[in-house]
Design a protein with these regions (language model features):
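Polytopic alpha-helical membrane-helix bundles and their juxtamembrane interface segments
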Residues: 19-211
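Low-acidity, Ser/Thr- and Arg-rich intrinsically disordered low-complexity segments
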Residues: 1-15
Length: 211
């Protein structure tokens, strides 16, 4: 039976082995992805929006290529993973614009993507549900730091935007908990970074402009 990238990592971690790549080209694709991400980070730090408009979506496309080369389309959890990455790509493209409409579109795309990540984690198997408390702790800390986000969202877009942001918080919380519950440290750290980065983004969007 074929295994998805996430399932192969889960299986290998339980055997204390390193998973074997499904394609010999995955190493090159991973290196290319890392290079694009490094370039995108440089563009963000240097405020090179012209470069970021290219590297941000390119990084997600490269991640999709890595997942595909790893055999993600062969299993249910892998297909959920691919769907999540596609919606992440859409969200990144939407957030390259500054308008409120693009922000809401990006928020919606990421919300759907996070639901697909949850489905991928659940399908792959949550062997250590107790670890979900780590995800809950990360979410709680982020909400404490960003306690002004919802009032800021209400001031910026009224009840509709407030409801959308609140729904997003719930979904990303579910992703954090389910990600940690897989029992995989790297997955847990990854979802935690997502929570932190989205909190920073929301603070910049809804809190700092009002300060």
């Amino acid at each position: 039976n074929a295994t998805s990238p996430l399932e192969s990592v889960v299986s290998a971690s339980r055997r204390d082995e390193v998973p074997v790549s499904a394609s010999p080209g995955i190493g090159l694709a991973a290196l290319l992805t890392a290079a694009i991400m490094a370039t995108n980070l440089w563009a963000v730090v240097r405020d090179r929006r012209d470069v970021e408009r290219v590297t941000k979506p390119a990084a997600m496309i490269a991640l999709l290529a890595v997942a595909a080369l790893a055999g993600a389309s062969d299993t249910a959890s892998g297909r959920w993973l691919l769907a999540a990455l596609v919606f992440g790509l859409i969200g990144d493209v939407m957030l390259l614009g500054a308008s409120s409409k693009r922000f809401v579109a990006g928020l919606t795309a990421f919300l759907v993507g996070h639901l697909f990540f949850v489905a991928s984690f659940v399908t792959a198997g949550m062997e250590r549900p107790g670890w979900g408390w780590f995800g809950l702790a990360v979410l709680s800390a982020s909400l404490a730091v960003g306690r002004g986000i919802l009032p800021g969202a209400r001031a910026a877009g009224g009840a509709p935007l407030t409801i959308a942001v609140a729904a997003y918080m719930l979904v990303i919380g579910a992703m954090a908990v389910s990600g940690w519950a897989t029992g995989l440290l790297l997955v847990g750290l990854g979802v935690s970074l997502f929570v932190v980065s989205d909190t920073v983004l929301a603070l910049g969007r809804f809190v700092e402009p009002r300060s």
